[in-house]
A protein has these predicted regions:
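Alpha-helical transmembrane segments of polytopic membrane proteins
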Residues: 1, 14-16, 42
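Membrane-embedded alpha-helical segments of integral membrane proteins
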Residues: 1-7
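Internal/C-terminal transmembrane anchor helices
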Residues: 9-35
Length: 229
């Protein structure tokens, strides 16, 4: 009888210990440094896509701001807020190379599309976004698809915007978003605005070339001038 009771106690301890170990392992996996860092990077990327620049800066402040990955997002956020020249020297950014990512990386092309869009280079923004979609193992993502629709609409390429809308319409979580964009496209169709055109070819491998072309297109481009200064 005592052996039987001892066995029951051991089984009870095991049944309690195993879930606790599983919870502990799960907490470690979620809150370990590599995973926290990845979550912060994804958060910065998402906030930048949504143009929530204060949240971009706030997230970077809670991370390692000396990490080179954050510097392009940091400078873009400061530039979009119009405070880049005044605030940049408060951060450990020491090279002009830190304003841009290599174009042959998925994360790089995704950011570079935001960078080009901020400079007013819409076609280059679309080109970089297409590059990001082509490099992604999952193909089109919802966030990049939404940007394609908005940017094509702004560029006046409404038929292509509608094609991307047709793709997004197959999802089940964008009904309200699609309704709003459909109304926007319908209003755009009633105007006679010409599609946006860039009459130059851009070497997107160099941010300085992008900045130079942006200033050539508009010598009062404050965002491009702030980057150069």
């Amino acid at each position: 009888c005592s052996v039987f009771l001892s066995g029951r106690k051991e089984n009870r301890y095991i049944s309690i210990a195993f879930p606790l170990l599983l919870i502990a392992f799960s907490c470690y996996s979620i809150y370990s440094s590599p995973n926290r860092e990845r979550e912060k990077r994804l958060a910065v990327q998402r906030y930048a896509e949504e143009q929530q620049w204060d949240r971009v800066l706030q997230t970077i402040h809670t991370s390692n701001s000396s990490e080179a990955y954050y510097h392009p997002y940091l400078m873009l956020a400061l530039n979009e807020k119009g405070i880049l020249p005044e605030q940049l020297f408060h951060y450990p950014v020491q090279s002009a190379d830190r304003i841009y990512f290599p174009a042959n990386e998925l994360g790089g092309a995704n950011f570079n599309s935001l960078f080009a869009y901020a400079l007013g280079l819409k076609h280059e923004a679309l080109h970089q976004l297409a590059q990001a979609n082509a490099m992604s193992p999952q193909g089109l993502s919802f966030s990049r698809l939404r940007r394609l629709i908005d940017w094509q609409t702004e560029s006046g390429n409404l038929p292509l915007a509608q094609k991307y809308m047709d793709i997004l319409q197959t999802s089940t979580c964008h009904n309200q978003w699609i309704k709003e964009r459909t109304e926007r496209i319908s209003k755009s169709l009633t105007t006679s605005e010409e599609a946006y055109k860039e009459d130059f070819i851009i070497d997107a491998s160099s941010p300085l070339i992008l900045l130079t072309q942006a200033i050539k297109a508009d010598t009062t481009n404050r965002k491009a001038l702030d980057y150069l200064l």
